[in-house]
Swiss-Prot record:
Residues 1-16 are cytoplasmic. The chain crosses the membrane at residues 17-37. It comes from Bacillus subtilis (strain 168). Coiled coil: none annotated. The keyword Transmembrane applies. B.subtilis contains five chromosomal type I signal peptidases: SipS, SipT, SipU, SipV and SipW. They have different, but overlapping, substrate specificities and have different transcription patterns. PROSITE patterns: SPASE_I_1, SPASE_I_2, SPASE_I_3. This is Signal peptidase I U. Pfam families: Peptidase_S26. It is a single-pass type II membrane protein. Its main location: membrane. Induction: Expressed constitutively.
Amino acid sequence: MNAKTITLKKKRKIKTIVVLSIIMIAALIFTIRLVFYKPFLIEGSSMAPTLKDSERILVDKAVKWTGGFHRGDIIVIHDKKSGRSFVKRLIGLPGDSIKMKNDQLYINDKKVEEPYLKEYKQEVKESGVTLTGDFEVEVPSGKYFVMGDNRLNSLDSRNGMGMPSEDDIIGTESLVFYPFGEMRQAK
């Protein structure tokens, strides 16, 4: 074997290693995305002003195994009956007592601030309307209470959607990634 043949074999070997590495990295990224993250299209205005129609979010599916859900999380729920998925804000956990009075949220008789609604509540209040009607509800074991941030225009646990179980929850919002110029974490 001459030096030229050895050099060609080394180049082919390096090329093969590079191609295989690219394929393995792509497969790893695809697997991570498939198992841990899912893109989701926002349809409608039920989460306005926090999330807008046609925005795209990345949903963290791993949260189900890494620490669970917390009040205030933005979650994606899959409705088995309709086959559709919805984005809502997690308000109540299993066993919670939820009360809304004069547009103020109380959980287990403790006043809860909703900073994500502060400006929106003020706008609505100036027009002489309350954002959320008064109600009281107990969250059953194994269920969650959810509402859209656009309380005047949201199908949620108050009015027909019911209370999802943990199995119905796909994951939590981790990033608004589209439109690209408005990337952010919505909270």
